[in-house]
């Protein structure tokens, strides 16, 4: 096996994401003609501490959302430096780009420029070795398929409806394999469509493929989902658990309160935590993401003390896939899980570092898409490569979401008999009920 293979060319172009906005796609070609291609995702509700996505801000073009500057940064600044490097030395390529940028949040070259090159490099390396991407990144022990966390009702910033909470998700914990898990979720999704239709609600889908009906209350979202689970022939609690992404940073006010802006309800942090506890007591919820705001460390501590042994408390805006933020969280004892979004940090190396740091501290890791996606399915491979055990990549509708699930089906098939679907064991750090 040749351990040194030169990167011959690096090229970026502007393509469109699932929302019709431009994004960056990069091709890395290694000696021998091995090509790696990667497209970069983009978020709607973004954490303040995320790496910077470079946009052109030219209002005459794509309403200011063009990414020609990021593309030029790849073609004119990054490419000349990376060409000639060893395609197998992922850390060296990533570290070189971090140095070239020189800012703490990748704001000079753009995380979208850097990430495209980073992921395409790994793909070219895998191609050169004749390996699947998950095998190249994860090695021989990459065999755990993730439990999907499927967003089937959208609210908050992801939908123009009456629902304050951003995402209501189902998790098929009782499935026997990933293939079975996907089937279960699709059946619930179709039953939910019927439940909503029968109640006179809209069944149009949002950015992530979930429904976005004008429900009477946030709690009604949970109720219609549980009805759909039962209609599909499954048992809430045994076959399915629920997950919520509150995106609370979007609700956080300067006076330290939380405003459910669509319903006009205001809550103190104590009331907010009581609210989550009431829902957890009432429904089979296993995961709560961003239950309080990214800078409300005191609120996070209270939430973790109250619910941290019972359910997964995921930090998304809180940690932004950043080891510095995660280290602070671990030291303060807040949350027990990290959401992993490659474009929040901007390189594959730093993404893998964050997952490793989380696991060492007894935190789970949930590999996640963004609301603006493409047909690129890299995150499916990352989830298996790291044995993360959970993936969050939307509803079983819209090709930009389904592309990831279909890739996981292929991976499960390729791994064969030794593949493992963890079910409830994905939550190794919780008291099992």
Curated annotation (Swiss-Prot):
Its main location: cytoplasm. One of its GO terms (cellular component) is phosphopyruvate hydratase complex. It catalyses: (2R)-2-phosphoglycerate = phosphoenolpyruvate + H2O. PROSITE patterns: ENOLASE. Binds a second Mg(2+) ion via substrate during catalysis. InterPro entries: Enolase (IPR000941), Enolase-like_C_sf (IPR036849), Enolase-like_N (IPR029017), Enolase_C (IPR020810), Enolase_CS (IPR020809), Enolase_N (IPR020811). The active site is at 208 (proton donor), 341 (proton acceptor). GO terms for biological process: glycolytic process. It is found in: Cytoplasm; Secreted; Cell surface. Its EC number is 4.2.1.11. (2R)-2-phosphoglycerate binds at residues 166, 341, 370-371, 392. It comes from the Bacteria. Belongs to the enolase family. Catalyzes the reversible conversion of 2-phosphoglycerate (2-PG) into phosphoenolpyruvate (PEP). It is essential for the degradation of carbohydrates via glycolysis. This is Enolase. It comes from Acetivibrio thermocellus (strain ATCC 27405 / DSM 1237 / JCM 9322 / NBRC 103400 / NCIMB 10682 / NRRL B-4536 / VPI 7372). The lineage of its organism: Bacteria, Bacillati, Bacillota, Clostridia, Eubacteriales.
